[in-house]
Amino acid sequence: MNKKRLLFRTPLDALFLLFGTALSACSSTATNVISSLSSAQKYFDAHKSELIKKNVINLLKEGYSTDSKATVNSLFAGWKYTLMDQKILERNLDASRFTKAFGTNKGKDDVIPSISEKGLFLDETYSGVSQQIAKVLGVQSQKVTGFSYSWSSTTNFKVVISFMMQGIVGSGEESNSLIKSFLSSGNNGNVTENDFNNGNANFDGTFIFTFTPPTDGRRFAFSNFDPITGTINFPANLQIDASTTHEKLNILMQNNEHVKKIKSRSFTGKSFDLLPFYFYALL
């Protein structure tokens, strides 16, 4: 063998070997950190100075390239932990922590999913009167009662989030006016305004949010981890199903052309930013 050629190649080989080892070590670190939510929490508890959104996104992005299933399951676990275990929609708001995760000028009503105008996408069903519809629901409290998820691939996953709520029908003048207009449209099954007077206005409701693979060809990919915008946008179809224990409301949800729209609604072309939930779980 030509010794000069050997001497020439050896430094290059060593450089490539070193570079490859560094990349492997980086990938290994990312995979270990995001292998589970608890692993990520332990890592950032020990490296608090590294807990910024850009770093978290880059770690998850690197982890996704080597173990997509573990990465997505870790993201889903953060989503569940923040909504169900940390109860951000039920407890008094930790303003500092919430702002760090969800951004400035954001509140509980901006959380998706939630029982709110934005969280229920009411503007897409009741254009022009979505605020009044939210007031008709008169949400007094809401609670995440179930959160299940499974992931096999970008074309085979499912997330189901269940909410229980307590509300008061017609909790203001605007909502009362809207109820009157709905009832005047007919097909009410003999339901009248008197059926919602005083204590009869109280009701319990259930909302179930089901996220499934998009039918428009979009897929969750490496590019969805965006450290520049500080987002991890997860594309999915969404179905929202509603039910209530209130007999008269149930009749309206079956018969009234306006009220029954809320019973079951499907949305396509949606993307859901999972980073705020994951980041909140790490804080």
From Swiss-Prot:
Identify one Pfam family in the record: Lipoprotein_3
- Membrane protein topology class: Lipid-anchor
What name has this protein been given in UniProt? Uncharacterized lipoprotein MG439 homolog 3
Predominantly, its location class is membrane
Organism from which the protein derives? Mycoplasma pneumoniae (strain ATCC 29342 / M129 / Subtype 1) (Mycoplasmoides pneumoniae)
Family under the similarity heading: Belongs to the MG439/MG440 family.
S-diacylglycerol cysteine lipidation sites on this chain? C26
Under InterPro entries, the record lists:
Lipoprotein_3 (IPR001595)
Compartment annotation: Cell membrane
* Transmembrane keyword on record: no
Alphabetized, the UniProt keywords read: Cell membrane, Lipoprotein, Membrane, Palmitate, Signal
Indicate yes or no for the key word Protein transport.
no
Q: Which residues form the signal peptide?
A: 1-25
Lipid group attachment sites (N-palmitoyl cysteine): C26
Q: Could you name the Gene Ontology cellular component terms for this entry? A: plasma membrane
Q: Which domain of life is it from?
A: Bacteria
